Amino acid sequence: KGSVLNLFAYTGGASLAAKAANMDVVHVDSIKQVVSWANENQAHSKLKGIRWVVEDALKFVSREVKRGKKYQGIILDPPAYGIGAKGERWKLEQKLGTLLEQVAQILSPKGFLVLNVYSLGLSPYIIQNLMKDYFGDRDFEISELCLNSRTNQILPLGIVARI
């Protein structure tokens, strides 16, 4: 058993999966209505005990760094662009490096990380370089997310990085 931090957690699918695996879960999203929806999903799933946090993810992680908190797993599904609850502007290309630098400080040495990226401004090579910069010699993998179309074209959707 360990703890999982789900950032940009939206309606909580990953939070529920982690809780069902008997993990302590912290679910962070900046939109109160979305966190309420996730809490309803927890009730429908007959699970209990997820910690709900309505806050800017970067601010939350920054405080966790100061507290010396460590997580066994961190899940990140940041939007390409967004506006936080207090009007904070989020642009993935500008903030991802800072976010990963701080996340690296709260991920336990043998912990796992899943990062989903949906931005045309970031390539798999950029994500690979960021992972090397902030997670050093830890083993990780990068994959592209895509769909096959009815016309036999591959449609790019995003990138996933996993430790």
Question: Where are the language model's segments positioned?
Answer:
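C-terminal catalytic and target-recognition region of SAM-dependent MTase-like enzymes
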Residues: 112-163
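Conserved class I S-adenosyl-L-methionine
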Residues: 2-10
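Conserved SAM-binding loop of SAM-dependent methyltransferases across substrates and taxa
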Residues: 11-23
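Helix-to-beta-strand junctions that scaffold the AdoMet/dcAdoMet cofactor pocket
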Residues: 107-108
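Mobile active-site "lid"/loop adjacent to the S-adenosyl-L-methionine
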Residues: 34, 54, 72-102
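S-adenosyl-L-methionine
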Residues: 31-75
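Conserved SAM-binding motif I beta-strand of class I
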Residues: 24-29
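A structural alpha-helix within SAM-dependent methyltransferase catalytic domains
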Residues: 16-19, 65, 100, 104
